[in-house]
Amino acid sequence: MGLCVVGLTVPSAVASADPTGGSDGQTWLAATETAPQYPGVSVEWDVPITMSDGTVLQANVYRPADASGRAVESKAPSVLNITPYTKLLGTLVDSALSIPQVGETLMDVANSLDLAAPFDGVSELTGVIAGGGARVLGVNRDLVQNGYTQVVVDARGTGFSQGNWDVLGKREQQDSVEVIDWMSKQGWSDGKVGMAGISYSAINSVQAASNNPPALKAIFPVEPGNDLLRDIVGTGGGLGVGFMPLWLTAVNGLKLIPNVQDILQGNFDPLWLASRLEDPGTLIPELVQAMTAQRIEDVSPSTLQVAQDGQFYQDRSADVGNITVPTMVYGGWHDIFANSEPRIYNGIDLPAGQKQLIMGNGYHVTPGGGFGKDGAPPRLDVLERAWFDKWLKGIDNGIERYGPVTMFQQGGGWITDDQFPRAGATYERMYLNSAPSGTAAHAAYDGSLTSDQPSAAARLTVAPGLRGFCSGDGTQGTAGISVVLGASCSKDSRFQEAEGLTFTGEAVTEPTSLSGPINVHLETVLDATDGFWAATVNDVAPDGTSTPITNGALTASLRAVDDSKSTRSANGDYSEPHHYLTIDTRQPVVPGEVTAVDINMLPTDAVLQPGHRLRVDVYAASVPRYLALGPMLADSQLKPQHIELAADRPSFVNVPFVGGR
């Protein structure tokens, strides 16, 4: 019996709410489109802020100004953005958007650009401008010209700030607390501070809020992570080689650019230079060794601490249960931090409305893509303004009635709910079956996905390959940069499926919804002492397009699960297995023996439309999204890997169907 019956969505208490914000959303938009309260912006460049250990951070301070450019005297709430990408990046974005002709042209082009294949990915990238993401990344002049002071600070050890880059560590978190305190005591401050920003800046805003500085009153984190190892550094024990090398190289390169103005004025900072000479390439030696070492015994202690779970990552994971200030989290199902974003929201102990979650369908480099269009949420900059107007200025604009959970339902459209996962989800096994589905002749193997256990035993073999470079996995793993390859790569798995095992269900007859995390359980056999497994869950359209809706991976020797941190569904199966991902709990595989592995997939929300099918893809590699660490890769010998399909030890996917099926 296949997946051919009905899945009915159970409406939640707020399912009729409008993802656009309705009349309130129009009010928020109007607030950003009308003439600003102040005509100008005054910028004070490279303001020194001295930390408790004597290290000096550099900040740009943007204040409301009159027509002559002179800062107004009135006190205002302030918004903080701490960045490792240098204040220069925000300045460049601000400069481009603040020139009337240029900014208007960019917005017009971004709103109208709709390129056909193979250039459709370019339209996704430009959507960050039309959707307001660029304003949140840079300086939001709408905020400043409407009575806010915005402060952009180079994180310790980056940009023009002194010190060694701490990469979201405890000292950097203390810096955030001290900068907030400094801001609240300035003559231009009314004592209320908010935090905003994208990615790294969003992470340190979540960290700061968990440390409860008194002056911090609200945060607006866009694409924050909170489990950096499982999010992107070492998902399932596989290094994120599509992102980490490029990211570390970029930040370390940017931090070496000196303050040319200070040099010209004879004010060059020798302490800045000393710190750069002391640590020119933070974490790069560790990254290289993690990729190239052939034996664990050859790995240095500094590399081990970033290659496995432990104190390094515990220090960088915020206790979101401590957060007491209003928090609006924006994320995306295909973001590199998709694992963390719903967890952050669910972990905050605040009433709905004071905490909110928006999950889009984009990638890390496309925040806000599609926002502001019919049926979609307001632009990100509009939401940011409304959020701070409410919680920093006390304006009754209804933003607390938005959401509280606004999601792009993959396969459908934007919906609003009162929780994620949505109520009414029931986990059910769908079994991997060797019987051909007749839908994937292009795949290395075309199997089926059934409600009943397979009656015939089979061993299926899959070998590592490189087709992941043109896949949804690859696009997510490069933070969305490879979306330029077009939807035939990013939104259709058929190219990658040529080197994968596919298991496809029967076509559904009515809309069938699923909501929450998913687990893929495999009974495996290896010919070496290690191996690597990657899996995706896909929505297969009648025309054959195989769209990935979630993914996951696991190094076979790191399969040990910490049950104290894992979740099981009512049927007794894992819905969210939490792997230790430590060397001490590593279990080399015995070649030839059947070994069970559970692969936790990213949380998701999706609907299969009538005629569509559910598919599970299984691969022995998915580069560049994941690459096994050097010693594990060496132990695998890149040999083919096998899945055992049998009634007494079945392989299956545990799926959260909403309202049954």
Task: Please provide the spans of the model-predicted regions.
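Accessory cap/linker subdomain of secreted extracellular hydrolases
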Residues: P84-Q145, S210-N322
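Secretory targeting and sorting signals
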Residues: M1-A17
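C-terminal, loop-rich substrate-recognition/catalytic regions characterized by aromatic stacking residues
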Residues: E278, K373-R661
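Alpha/beta-hydrolase fold nucleophile elbow
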Residues: G187-S199
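Catalytic-loop region of hydrolases
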Residues: A15-L113, L137-V139, A443-S490, G660-R661
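Conserved alpha/beta-hydrolase
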Residues: V144-G159
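Alpha/beta-hydrolase active-site loop
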Residues: A134-R135, Q145, V167-Q186
